[in-house]
Amino acid sequence: MTVLIHVLGSDIPHHNHTVLRFFNDTLAATSEHAREFMVAGEDNGFTESCPALSLRFYGSKKALAQAVIAKAKANRRQRFFFHGQFNTSLWLALLSGGIKPAQFYWHIWGADLYEVSNGLKFRLFYPLRRIAQGRVGCVFATRGDLSYFARQHPDVRGELLYFPTRMDPSLNAMAKECQRAGKLTILVGNSGDRSNQHIAALRAVYQQFGDTVNVVVPMGYPANNQDYIDEVRQAGLALFSAENLQILSEKMEFDAYLALLRQCDLGYFIFARQQGIGTLCLLIQADIPCVLNRDNPFWQDMAEQHLPVLFTTDDLNEQVVREAQRQLASVDKSGITFFSPNYLQPWHNALRIAAGEAE
């Protein structure tokens, strides 16, 4: 029997760390198909912190892709589980036959599904990638992303799967510790990545609430982002008084991030694609409602779980926010499909499907 190989095809330390720790701590002990990884980027202590996994690291996305293609060609029974996939060479290999559809299983993280960049090289590549994605053996994704993908590729199998957000089920009641009165505090974006469209989001918040709310913008990740942070701060201070705007430029530890979320009343996410599920989960867990772009298909997942959804096009005010908080507080968090531990069983199913052990 050929063991399934997992591929992290781009050097995204935060996401890769989350996936590797999840596999090491939760899946590796019960499945031999959860232990082999090929990773783009440096070790960064992963080998030491994930002793249950067999990890191979590659200095570039291209080097990793070449190694995957060589393995795929050498053994056509070898199957790969691709997580995310911000790797042009791998899509081209699937398109050209270097990797066969029966070898290619893909967990959609969001960015590689949507065509949001206006750069010329991206606009030229998107049609090729779209064709290649129609050759995937099976995709795993959120409900909203599965719906989006199926409109383009109705013949490709799709299975529900959620990114393994680090969650403590005992915190499902942490909202009881939160204060829900006074001036609203609004979290804008889930990181410092430009995909959060921070400036547009700040303008939208100002248009809805004026300079009457506290605005918190977490921008400690990714690193080496000071120019963009300064740009966002300047734009924010043109809208909000200094005491109402908090730009967080330092990376935060998980417990500190949870403490920050407990101070918030609303999350505001203007991006038009699925991303930031981890932050959304932690907000929902704390009974903090989220404002989404109507083009972000994750609203379908939230509605399926009977969670209140606010949209950027809604008329928002404190009364609307407090009512959404009340509705969230009435939801039994233990039954939410994309919360831990409920997302575990779909992961076990996904491993069996990708390994060829389940129909």
UniProtKB/Swiss-Prot annotation:
It comes from the Bacteria. It catalyses: beta-D-ManNAcA-(1->4)-alpha-D-GlcNAc-di-trans,octa-cis-undecaprenyl diphosphate + dTDP-4-acetamido-4,6-dideoxy-alpha-D-galactose = alpha-D-FucNAc4-(1->4)-beta-D-ManNAcA-(1->4)-D-GlcNAc-undecaprenyl diphosphate + dTDP + H(+). Its main location: membrane. Its EC number is 2.4.1.325. GO terms for molecular function: 4-acetamido-4,6-dideoxy-D-galactose transferase activity; fucosyltransferase activity. It is a peripheral membrane protein. Disulfide bonds: none annotated. It is found in: Cell inner membrane. Keywords: Cell inner membrane, Cell membrane, Glycosyltransferase, Membrane, Transferase. GO terms for cellular component: plasma membrane. The keyword Membrane applies. Pathway: Bacterial outer membrane biogenesis; enterobacterial common antigen biosynthesis. The keyword RNA-binding does not apply. It is an enzyme of class 2 (transferase). One of its GO terms (biological process) is enterobacterial common antigen biosynthetic process. Signal peptide: none annotated. Belongs to the glycosyltransferase 56 family. Catalyzes the synthesis of Und-PP-GlcNAc-ManNAcA-Fuc4NAc (Lipid III), the third lipid-linked intermediate involved in ECA synthesis. This is TDP-N-acetylfucosamine:lipid II N-acetylfucosaminyltransferase. It comes from Salmonella newport (strain SL254). The gene is wecF.
